[in-house]
Each structure stands twice: as structure tokens, then as C-alpha cells.
Amino acid sequence: MGDWSFLGRLLENAQEHSTVIGKVWLTVLFIFRILVLGAAAEDVWGDEQSDFTCNTQQPGCENVCYDRAFPISHIRFWALQIIFVSTPTLIYLGHVLHIVRMEEKKKEREEEEQLKRESPSPKEPPQDNPSSRDDRGRVRMAGALLRTYVFNIIFKTLFEVGFIAGQYFLYGFELKPLYRCDRWPCPNTVDCFISRPTEKTIFIIFMLAVACASLLLNMLEIYHLGWKKLKQGVTSRLGPDASEAPLGTADPPPLPPSSRPPAVAIGFPPYYAHTAAPLGQARAVGYPGAPPPAADFKLLALTEARGKGQSAKLYNGHHHLLMTEQNWANQAAERQPPALKAYPAASTPAAPSPVGSSSPPLAHEAEAGAAPLLLDGSGSSLEGSALAGTPEEEEQAVTTAAQMHQPPLPLGDPGRASKASRASSGRARPEDLAI
């Protein structure tokens, strides 16, 4: 057959821009197909028509039987197989050469532009396109070039499968020495004989094995490219995170918890109660933030009562008891002789009260533990609104106070006593404090 050197040179150029499996495939194509076909197969099939004989004298019967036995010669069939299988690789090579030529033109334009400049920089090397060249100077297989290479492999695989199937349906994988032919113009079924059938069968099996090996290499290359691209895709997604966080580095320390402002406990304002000041002294009312007065005040902590109703009831009773004691103290002050009234009001002793009447208020105060409030002689509206009880409870508290504090027998005018009693129920009048 013809010279295969031109095709070999083209495929050799394509081998430089192929993968490892692609280079192996081209090696198999060169050695086990082109060389075997050109060196041995032509000699084996060179005399196949001249040595094909039939037991008939009918003119044309032998040629018709040969055409039916071998629709296409094995040599020409394998030559077509090599050409068809190599065509996708040649197309890929044309794409590579196109890219190389475009790069050369680009370099030439850059050199021309550099020469046209007023101050050229000869030391500046021409910059290559990083997307088309790798670190070894070869054309990078990416983008459109990669798609061309993948289509190259797919079409090679399809051609291999097609030619293997065609060989099976045309010849089968074995040549028999005897071939029976009944085709016209043969008068009857004639026997035809094939020369060197065993040798030809060996070559058929060998070429079939080479075709299967090429098909397997194509499938491996598809798997290799698919796995490589899948790995690159995963690496491109996870690569930046892995590069920023090298191995062996500890996790960053957790952020400190957000500092919250300290909880401000809002309590009730303190209340100051007078400790039984004498009648002549003015009563001072405490309020939050005010400086303490000169009189003796006692700061009582605000505690929660066990029962609201019980504490209010007991405190109402205690309040009325204190009012009753103050009334008796006013009466005693009025009965004092003029010599004793000349003394300061601060030296006036505490109001006399029976022994039995002083202990119950203290006992009630310790037992109830009610919230202390500011006590004055007149009873403020705050006390009345916060600790006001039902009329029955107030009546019971007043009755208890009357039972515990029996008034002494009047020594003077009973009218004055009733008059002082009416005056003590309200605010102190100026005539009560007159000396």
C-alpha cells in the first residue's frame, strides 16, 4: 500500500499535546497497526484473489464467488479503520496548531508595538497567555481545546466499535478453507478454496485484539479526564479554604461573650419613722436622698409581709394605740402645774401608759413584721390609702385599744377632758402647745 510516513508525522505532532493514555494509544496505533499492516499483512493477502479457486468452468462464476466471500479486502478494511480512527486525532491536532499560530501572531503584534514606542524596554520579555500555556511551555488543555480532545476520544471509540462490528458481520473472526457458493451465473452450488486460511485467521485475530486494546485505552482516557476534571472542580471549591487554613494550626480562640450591663436592682425608697418624739418637737418627714434630720430617726428595712390583710389589720390597731397614748400624754401635759410647764418640752417624759397596754403593741409589731411607714400624729393620706382596712376591722381595732387602755379617773374638770379628747383626734392646735 501507500506510504504511511506522512500520517505518522502528523500523529507524532499530536502526541506532544495528548495525555499519557493518549500517547499510549498512539504508540499502539503506530506499532501494532500501521507497521504490522505495512510489513506483513500485505504479503499475506497479496495473492488472495489469484489463489481463490472454484471447481467450475463457468466463466465469471469464480469472480462472483470471490466478491461474495470478500466484499472488501481485509487489508483495505484495516486501512480504512486506521484512517477513520486517526481522523479525530488529526482534527484535535489542527485545533492545537491553530492556537499555536494565534499565539505567534500575538507575539508578533506585541513586538511590532514595542518597536513603535518611543522608549522601548528591550529587557521586558513577551508575556504569554497563562490560559493557553502551562509551566512546560505546552498548550494547556482547557476550555475549547479540552472539549475538542474529549470529542476526539468519543469519536475514536465509536469508530472502533463500528469497525469491529462491521468486521464480524462481513467476515466473522475465522476463515474456513472451504467456501460454498451458489450465486448466479454458477450452474449449481460450487466449492471454492481459500489460500492460507490459518495464517489469515491469525492476522484477523491479531488485528481484532489491537482494536479491542485501542477501545479499552479510549475508555480509560475518558475515565481519566472525567476523574481529573472532577477532582479539579472539588479542589477549586475547597482549595482557597485549605490554603488559608494550613494543617496543624489550632482553631481560633472563641470570641469572649458579650458583656452585659450589670443588673440594676430597683428597690423601694427607704422610709423613716420617728421614735416617739415629744409633743413640742416638729415632726420631719423623710424622703429618698434627703439628709437625715437632727432628731433621732430609725431606718427600717422594707420587708415583705406574710399576709397583706393581716399586716394591714395589725398595723391599723397599732396606729390607733399610738394615737390613744398620745391623747393621754396631751391630757397629762394640760394637767401639769405651771411650775413644771416652764421646763423645755424636750425634758417632758414619755406619756404614761398602763403596763398592760405597752406590751401588746410591741408583741404585735414583732409578730406581724409589717412594712414600716412614716408615722405622725395626724396620720397621712399615704398611710390611709396603703393600709386602710374595712370598717369592721377599724372598729375592732378601736375597741381593742379601748379595752387595753383604761383611762384614769379625771381629777379636774370633765369638760376639759372631753374637750382635750376631741382635740387629740385631729391635728394639734396652737392652744394645746401654749405654756
From Swiss-Prot:
<dbReference type="InterPro" id="IPR019570">
    <property type="entry name" value="Connexin_CCC"/>
</dbReference>
<comment type="function">
    <text>Structural component of lens fiber gap junctions. Gap junctions are dodecameric channels that connect the cytoplasm of adjoining cells. They are formed by the docking of two hexameric hemichannels, one from each cell membrane. Small molecules and ions diffuse from one cell to a neighboring cell via the central pore.</text>
</comment>
<dbReference type="GO" id="GO:1990349">
    <property type="term" value="P:gap junction-mediated intercellular transport"/>
</dbReference>
<keyword id="KW-1133">Transmembrane helix</keyword>
<feature type="compositionally biased region" description="Low complexity">
    <location>
        <begin position="415"/>
        <end position="427"/>
    </location>
</feature>
<feature type="intramembrane region">
    <location>
        <begin position="2"/>
        <end position="15"/>
    </location>
</feature>
<keyword id="KW-0965">Cell junction</keyword>
<feature type="topological domain" description="Cytoplasmic">
    <location>
        <begin position="16"/>
        <end position="19"/>
    </location>
</feature>
<comment type="subunit">
    <text>A hemichannel or connexon is composed of a hexamer of connexins. A functional gap junction is formed by the apposition of two hemichannels. Forms heteromeric channels with GJA8.</text>
</comment>
<protein>
    <recommendedName>
        <fullName>Gap junction alpha-3 protein</fullName>
    </recommendedName>
</protein>
<feature type="region of interest" description="Disordered">
    <location>
        <begin position="108"/>
        <end position="136"/>
    </location>
</feature>
<feature type="topological domain" description="Extracellular">
    <location>
        <begin position="41"/>
        <end position="71"/>
    </location>
</feature>
<feature type="disulfide bond">
    <location>
        <begin position="61"/>
        <end position="186"/>
    </location>
</feature>
<dbReference type="GO" id="GO:0005886">
    <property type="term" value="C:plasma membrane"/>
</dbReference>
<keyword id="KW-1015">Disulfide bond</keyword>
<feature type="transmembrane region" description="Helical">
    <location>
        <begin position="20"/>
        <end position="40"/>
    </location>
</feature>
<keyword id="KW-0812">Transmembrane</keyword>
<dbReference type="InterPro" id="IPR013092">
    <property type="entry name" value="Connexin_N"/>
</dbReference>
<keyword id="KW-0303">Gap junction</keyword>
<feature type="topological domain" description="Extracellular">
    <location>
        <begin position="174"/>
        <end position="201"/>
    </location>
</feature>
<feature type="disulfide bond">
    <location>
        <begin position="65"/>
        <end position="181"/>
    </location>
</feature>
<feature type="topological domain" description="Cytoplasmic">
    <location>
        <begin position="223"/>
        <end position="435"/>
    </location>
</feature>
<feature type="transmembrane region" description="Helical">
    <location>
        <begin position="153"/>
        <end position="173"/>
    </location>
</feature>
<dbReference type="GO" id="GO:0007601">
    <property type="term" value="P:visual perception"/>
</dbReference>
<dbReference type="InterPro" id="IPR038359">
    <property type="entry name" value="Connexin_N_sf"/>
</dbReference>
<dbReference type="InterPro" id="IPR002262">
    <property type="entry name" value="Connexin46"/>
</dbReference>
<keyword id="KW-0898">Cataract</keyword>
<dbReference type="GO" id="GO:0005922">
    <property type="term" value="C:connexin complex"/>
</dbReference>
<dbReference type="Pfam" id="PF00029">
    <property type="entry name" value="Connexin"/>
</dbReference>
<feature type="region of interest" description="Disordered">
    <location>
        <begin position="332"/>
        <end position="435"/>
    </location>
</feature>
<dbReference type="InterPro" id="IPR017990">
    <property type="entry name" value="Connexin_CS"/>
</dbReference>
<keyword id="KW-1003">Cell membrane</keyword>
<keyword id="KW-0225">Disease variant</keyword>
<dbReference type="GO" id="GO:0007267">
    <property type="term" value="P:cell-cell signaling"/>
</dbReference>
<keyword id="KW-0472">Membrane</keyword>
<feature type="compositionally biased region" description="Basic and acidic residues">
    <location>
        <begin position="108"/>
        <end position="121"/>
    </location>
</feature>
<comment type="similarity">
    <text>Belongs to the connexin family. Alpha-type (group II) subfamily.</text>
</comment>
<feature type="transmembrane region" description="Helical">
    <location>
        <begin position="72"/>
        <end position="92"/>
    </location>
</feature>
<dbReference type="GO" id="GO:0055077">
    <property type="term" value="F:gap junction hemi-channel activity"/>
</dbReference>
<dbReference type="InterPro" id="IPR034634">
    <property type="entry name" value="Connexin_C"/>
</dbReference>
<feature type="compositionally biased region" description="Low complexity">
    <location>
        <begin position="342"/>
        <end position="389"/>
    </location>
</feature>
<feature type="transmembrane region" description="Helical">
    <location>
        <begin position="202"/>
        <end position="222"/>
    </location>
</feature>
